[in-house]
């Protein structure tokens, strides 16, 4: 028999859905029913989500200065809050947990107005706009990188780390095996769950600058946008190299586990998964983020020595080619980076976050939770 329902709310990108998925597995293990409320974008990421039910409520972001668009967004938001109130009255959750993204705003606002215990989890080192708007209203804030002794609400913030999915925990069991001269070198390239156009242009050019013996060693897994598939595939065929190119890989954790080097953006989930699995990486923060959250995430892991951070403006194909050449000829250096990254990982983040959810659902104060250390 279920202990009750926990309602998780997450925006429809992998960065929001994946940590919610990790928590959902942990809560199910502890006997709770889990419902997910999200938007239509999450469909591609929610295939393995262990939710008893998935709900979609209307929501919108208010980013335009056009008064007509603002009015439409406000109406959609109001409609979403009404739908969320109806959902909460129907399923009667013990607690509502938000993971960021504008689709979390209606259910979290509805919960706080209805007196239902609510909390948020912020994956990044800098709080996102949706979570920032909700932070004052909820009982507790869990953070992937947020410090407990800083920020606006230190008294109700707990640094749990970012929960990672079971597939990541499984991949972490595989030790890092340094590359061997003349053997295949596995390079994994991705730009977060939505891909990165920049890598689609820079990586093939950089590889073309490598000497033929090095180029023939490369085995590349690269996530690209659908519109870039043909171009990237054409480049890899011309270079006569082993490549697996796709818009999305459902087994990305396993592929990272098999990598000698990872080249990627530095979203919170990505950084956390790299650390738990323990793989060396070149992080290229997304340069147009409003709050520069990816740069802050990257800096947190770079401080351990597990990754190198290079701004996109500085990473020319020539520089990337030089980096790849060095990585393929200095396996000991990558092995040290892998060990440093793994030491920074928090594989128990999902358990700590589940402890926190249970405390809030039981209407314990977050101060009591922090004081008890349980």
Curated annotation (Swiss-Prot):
> Which keywords label this protein?
Cell cycle, Cell division, Cell inner membrane, Cell membrane, Cell shape, Cell wall biogenesis/degradation, Glycosyltransferase, Membrane, Peptidoglycan synthesis, Transferase
Q: Where in the cell is it found?
A: Cell inner membrane
What molecular function terms (GO) are annotated for this protein?
A: UDP-N-acetyl-D-glucosamine:N-acetylmuramoyl-L-alanyl-D-glutamyl-meso-2,6-diaminopimelyl-D-alanyl-D-alanine-diphosphoundecaprenol 4-beta-N-acetylglucosaminlytransferase activity; undecaprenyldiphospho-muramoylpentapeptide beta-N-acetylglucosaminyltransferase activity
Keyword GTP-binding assigned: no
Q: Name one GO cellular component term.
A: plasma membrane
Quick one: which residues bind UDP-N-acetyl-alpha-D-glucosamine?
A: 13-15, 124, 165, 193, 294
Q: Does the keyword Amino-acid biosynthesis apply?
A: no
Instruction: Give the GO terms filed under biological process for this record.
Output: carbohydrate metabolic process; cell division; cell wall organization; lipid glycosylation; peptidoglycan biosynthetic process; regulation of cell shape
Where does the source fall among the domains of life? Bacteria
**What pathway is this protein said to act in by its record?**
Cell wall biogenesis; peptidoglycan biosynthesis
What is the catalytic activity of this protein? di-trans,octa-cis-undecaprenyl diphospho-N-acetyl-alpha-D-muramoyl-L-alanyl-D-glutamyl-meso-2,6-diaminopimeloyl-D-alanyl-D-alanine + UDP-N-acetyl-alpha-D-glucosamine = di-trans,octa-cis-undecaprenyl diphospho-[N-acetyl-alpha-D-glucosaminyl-(1->4)]-N-acetyl-alpha-D-muramoyl-L-alanyl-D-glutamyl-meso-2,6-diaminopimeloyl-D-alanyl-D-alanine + UDP + H(+)
Provide the primary localization: membrane
Q: What is its EC number?
A: 2.4.1.227
One Pfam family, please name it.
Glyco_transf_28
Per the record, membrane topology reads: Peripheral membrane protein
Summarize the protein's role.
Cell wall formation. Catalyzes the transfer of a GlcNAc subunit on undecaprenyl-pyrophosphoryl-MurNAc-pentapeptide (lipid intermediate I) to form undecaprenyl-pyrophosphoryl-MurNAc-(pentapeptide)GlcNAc (lipid intermediate II).
Q: Which family does it belong to?
A: Belongs to the glycosyltransferase 28 family. MurG subfamily.
User: What PANTHER family does the record tag this protein with?
Assistant: GLYCOSYLTRANSFERASE (PTHR21015:SF22), UDP-N-ACETYLGLUCOSAMINE--N-ACETYLMURAMYL-(PENTAPEPTIDE) PYROPHOSPHORYL-UNDECAPRENOL N-ACETYLGLUCOSAMINE TRANSFERASE 1 (PTHR21015)
Q: What is this protein called?
A: UDP-N-acetylglucosamine--N-acetylmuramyl-(pentapeptide) pyrophosphoryl-undecaprenol N-acetylglucosamine transferase
């Amino acid at each position: 028999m279920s202990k009750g329902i926990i309602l998780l709310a997450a925006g429809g990108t992998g960065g929001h859905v994946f940590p919610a998925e990790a928590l959902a597995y942990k809560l199910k293990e502890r006997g709770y029913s889990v419902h997910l409320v999200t938007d239509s974008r999450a469909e591609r990421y929610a295939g393995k989500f262990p939710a008893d039910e998935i709900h979609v409520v209307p929501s919108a972001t208010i980013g335009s200065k056009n008064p007509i668009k603002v009015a439409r967004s406000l109406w959609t938001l109001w409609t979403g809050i009404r739908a969320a109130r109806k959902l909460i009255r129907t399923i009667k959750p013990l607690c509502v947990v938000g993971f960021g993204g504008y689709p979390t705003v209606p259910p979290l606002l509805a919960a706080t107005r209805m007196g239902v215990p609510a909390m948020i989890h912020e994956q990044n080192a800098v709080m996102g706009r949706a979570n920032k708007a909700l932070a004052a209203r909820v009982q507790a804030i869990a953070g992937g990188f947020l410090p407990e002794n800083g920020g606006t609400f230190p008294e109700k913030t707990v640094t749990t780390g970012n929960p990672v999915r079971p597939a990541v925990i499984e991949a972490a069991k595989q030790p890092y095996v340094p590359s061997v001269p003349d053997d295949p070198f596995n390079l994994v390239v991705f730009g977060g769950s939505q891909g990165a156009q920049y890598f689609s242009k820079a990586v093939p050019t950089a590889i073309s600058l490598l000497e033929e013996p090095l180029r023939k060693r490369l085995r590349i897994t690269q996530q690209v946008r659908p519109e870039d598939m043909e171009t990237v595939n054409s480049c890899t065929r011309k270079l006569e190299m082993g490549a697996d190119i796709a818009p999305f890989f459902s087994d990305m954790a396993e592929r990272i586990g098999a990598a000698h080097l990872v080249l990627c953006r530095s979203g919170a989930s990505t950084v956390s998964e790299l650390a738990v699995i323990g793989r060396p990486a070149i992080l290229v923060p997304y340069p147009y983020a409003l709050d520069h959250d990816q740069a802050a995430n990257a800096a947190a892991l770079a401080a351990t020595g597990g990754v190198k951070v290079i701004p996109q403006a500085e990473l020319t194909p020539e520089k990337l080619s030089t980096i790849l050449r060095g990585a393929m000829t200095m396996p000991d250096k990558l092995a040290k980076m892998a060990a440093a990254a793994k030491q920074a990982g928090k594989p128990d983040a999902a358990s700590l976050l589940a402890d926190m959810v249970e405390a809030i659902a039981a209407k314990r104060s977050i101060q009591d939770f922090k004081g008890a250390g349980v």
